[in-house]
Amino acid sequence: MTRGLTYSLTELATAIGATVQGDGDCKIHNVAAIAQAQPGEISFVTDRKYRKYLTQTKASAILLDEKLASRCPINALVMSNPKLGFAKLLTLLRPQSLPTGGIHPTAVVGANCQIDPSAHIGAHVVIEEDVVIGPRTLIGAGASIGRGSQIGSDCCLHSRVTLYSQTRIGDRSIIHSGAVIGADGFGLIQDEKGEWVKIPQVGRVIIGDDVEIGANATIDRGALDDTVIGNGVKIDDLVMIAHNVRIGDHTVIAGCAGVAGSTTVGRHCMIGASAGLNGHIEICDNVIITGMGMIQKSITKPGIYSSGTGMQTNREWRKSVIRFWQLDELAKRLKRLEKLIR
């Protein structure tokens, strides 16, 4: 357990926008799961199935919503969105210790770079020429920063992140290990012999403020226009964003999803795991695409969209597939019957 700072319940309530139920002077130094929490720690309950622990936990306080507050026999912080409060508590009680500024002696830095003295450049990092890195930004071991790239302040690029040339990253963004930003888009054209000819990809990747990109995600550079990731976008591990895509502010994309080239996704959208979006389409603001959804055309109205089939036993699924194959013949038979009735 990592012990952070100590706060009273009243101080925590003020910080996260909650109401104190019980002793506001109770001291808290850590956040823990409700089944394992000990005195001096605060836990949280967001799911009704865990409410049995309210009378069993050793925690000094619980973070919960108004509906569960009356069932809590110990000190509590009460708010309408305990999950949001939990995130804020972790930031307060488990502050990350960042390394001091400086460039590791094994790092390679090209000519004409502007690296703020407070930035931390880890071991074996390669920074090509004309790169700009802002204050308090951390570049992890083995990362590669391409020529002419610009990274804002308070960013964290974990070990072995790769930025191709001319990439732009705003402030307070996080990129996890193995992510590749700015690789060539999948631009090809067949010649008269039927052979594939590569189309040079000369655009950039532009990433806004407060963006998080998961491990081994890939975002390709644009062909001519830039690939743009808006402010506050959160991209999970193993997501693929193709060339010329534009992702609107505060959209989230879950793991293994893919967005094909030149597609625009609006603001405040949610794209489920393993979803696939066709190229050259537009998704309006406030759209939710459920897991494994296959989106082949533009969506113009906010709402929830699904296209996958629910789980069945193998036996049931095989029957469903056979019936699906029979739909065309059934439709023809239905038309013939309609003609007879008329």
Swiss-Prot record:
**Pathway assigned to this chain's UniProt record:** Bacterial outer membrane biogenesis; LPS lipid A biosynthesis
**What is one process in the GO biological process aspect for this record?**
lipid A biosynthetic process
Instruction: Give an example GO cellular component term for this record.
Output: membrane
Lipid metabolism keyword on record: yes
* CDD domains (alphabetical): LbH_LpxD (cd03352)
Q: Which InterPro entries match?
A: Hexapep, LpxD, Trimer_LpxA-like_sf, UDP_GlcNAc_AcTrfase_non-rep
Could you say which EC number(s) this protein's record lists?
A: 2.3.1.191
Q: Which UniProt keywords apply?
A: Acyltransferase, Lipid A biosynthesis, Lipid biosynthesis, Lipid metabolism, Repeat, Transferase
* Pfam families the UniProt entry points to: Hexapep, Hexapep_2, LpxD
Q: Does the keyword Acyltransferase apply?
A: yes
Q: Which one of the record's GO molecular function terms can you name? A: N-acyltransferase activity
Write down the chemical reaction(s) this protein catalyses: a UDP-3-O-[(3R)-3-hydroxyacyl]-alpha-D-glucosamine + a (3R)-hydroxyacyl-[ACP] = a UDP-2-N,3-O-bis[(3R)-3-hydroxyacyl]-alpha-D-glucosamine + holo-[ACP] + H(+)
Q: Which residues form the active site?
A: 243
Q: Which Gene3D superfamilies match?
A: 1.20.5.170, Hexapeptide repeat proteins (2.160.10.10), MurE/MurF, N-terminal domain (3.40.1390.10)
What general EC class does the enzyme of this chain belong to?
Answer: transferase
Q: Partners and quaternary state?
A: Homotrimer.
What is the recorded function of this protein according to its Swiss-Prot or TrEMBL entry? Catalyzes the N-acylation of UDP-3-O-acylglucosamine using 3-hydroxyacyl-ACP as the acyl donor. Is involved in the biosynthesis of lipid A, a phosphorylated glycolipid that anchors the lipopolysaccharide to the outer membrane of the cell.
What's this protein's family per the entry? Answer: Belongs to the transferase hexapeptide repeat family. LpxD subfamily.
Q: What is this protein called?
A: UDP-3-O-acylglucosamine N-acyltransferase
Species for this entry: Coxiella burnetii (strain RSA 493 / Nine Mile phase I)
